[in-house]
């Protein structure tokens, strides 16, 4: 009890918290300054590993999450590939990482990670589909695969199962052009602009019949399992409803992203 009282007095005297004492009814925590509290646990800023913001959904997510940390120094490290984001998180380079639920479930089989925030379906991407040249969806022999994308690897394995289909390593952002050139027959891709497919002579087939395809659309935030201050900070500052509303305003064009 003595240590607890001493800690509370230190926090109170620094202005990090305000306690209201009510005699026999006890004492109540009535105000907290999260920015000031962070200094007491040696956290001067928060850095989140985030996908490259090449879609409005990603921009809205980045902008909405940053807005929740108002008053707290919060920064992004944008990088492609969930594997590298999680590796940097585990190595202590960053404090948290945004990945899909599908990727997160594969990483959580390892030790050292905590699923700290879940945002629901279609908060990470809209929908993945199988892209191929028109009329050739039944003739796929070579499928493109970016080995840095945990989602694409898992979904490709789920969709093609034990089929005799060759996996061809390529960059995710080159996928459509590689199909057009005939280097590969198909790729699993997050379709953002349907008109782009039409112009390229490609068609999209929705992925269904497996819950993992839906998991790939959900954004989650991972922390290190022993980073209790960061987990508590997320619980304290993030209003999920406000974050998602912010994301949708960015997607619809009502609000410019800021991240």
Where on the chain are the PLM-derived regions?
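Short helix-initiation/N-cap motifs at beta->coil->alpha
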Residues: 76-87, 166-180
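Short, acidic/turn-prone active-site loops that include or flank metal/cofactor-
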Residues: 102-104, 120-123, 170-172, 191-194, ...
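Short, hydrophobic/proline-enriched secondary-structure or compact coil segments at domain edges
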Residues: 143-145, 188, 219-222
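Periplasmic-binding protein-like
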Residues: 33, 118-133, 199-235, 239
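Active-site regions of enzymes building and remodeling cell-envelope glycoconjugates
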Residues: 112-117, 161-168, 201-207
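N-terminal hydrophobic or amphipathic helices and topogenic motifs
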Residues: 1-84, 93, 213-215, 227-259
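Mid-protein regulatory/catalytic core that forms ligand/cofactor-binding pockets
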Residues: 52-157
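A ligand-binding cleft/hinge motif common to bilobed small-molecule-binding domains
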Residues: 98-111, 177-206
